[in-house]
Amino acid sequence: LTKNTMQRTFCSVIGCLKNMIYKKIMINNFGLDAFVVNNFKHVKLWQLMLPFLVLILFFLFFLFSEETNFVDAYVESQKGLFLSMNSTLAAYPNIQLNITELGDVFVIFPLIIVFLFYAPKLWEVLLTSSLITLILAAVLKKYFYVPRPAHVYDIDSFIIIGKTHLGNKSFPSGHSMTIFVVIILLLFAFMPKKKSYTIVWSLLMLLAGFSIAFSRVAVGAHYPFDVVIGIALGFIAAIIGIRVNNNVRWLVWIKNKRFYPGFMLLLIIWIALIILKIIDHNLPIFYLSLMSLVGTLFLITRAYAKQN
């Protein structure tokens, strides 16, 4: 009798778990966009204080620097820090080579492309924030014209993983800006309600963001301050993107299934581009992007076919 009671109790628990999981799946499938919209409504402008403080302190530091030339002061002031971080982080070259690719829109966007189908609001904000990031990066890189580490330091003095980046477009790091736009949007979009979960979620997301951003130092492509300012600017672009889309719904057409054929064509082109990347470099991270693109193409195609 006791054994039968235990079995019934166990089955009841399993049944409850199944119902909870089923309800969770149903919420994810049909209410995820509403969940994201509601979370974005709680994002406030005061949350820009920290990244703006970072920017102010950064420019004050160089404003009162003894060097008259910003570029010279910028490069020399962090040489020791760059060499130290590069040496430490480059201890895992294969990992760094893969995760640094996550700062590339052609690689990171496919990994979250499925939310175009399940949470289009996230993509409305992502496109707005990405446009802001693109403009900021282009203007600042051209204005400051800071040479890359490999253009200034002896290339035998530090570790370069993958491609050797030259030229004068080091500041700020575009990869860091991109990844932090994505990280901050995901952070707020899927912020849990419980405080304990919120803390864990925030720490995990920020840890992932910092790890990816500072991989740019590990591969020898950027100075540490390039990354720090890139992070701050990405944070700012994400918050502004959220606030803009809370008030101006200029990309609301994204969720309209009439435009699915255009998205399907875009996904096919994107798949081809990722395949070319795989042919050229064959990194595992590219396969994850490819699988995500193929899966999303299947979902959107099926949804469009059912509608028609």
Segments predicted by a language model, with ranges:
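Hydrophobic alpha-helical transmembrane segments of integral membrane proteins
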Residues: 124-153, 212-220, 224-227
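Juxtamembrane/transmembrane-helix boundary motifs in multi-pass membrane proteins
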Residues: 39-46, 88-92, 116-121, 125, ...
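Alpha-helical transmembrane segments
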Residues: 48-59, 131-133, 206-207, 264-267
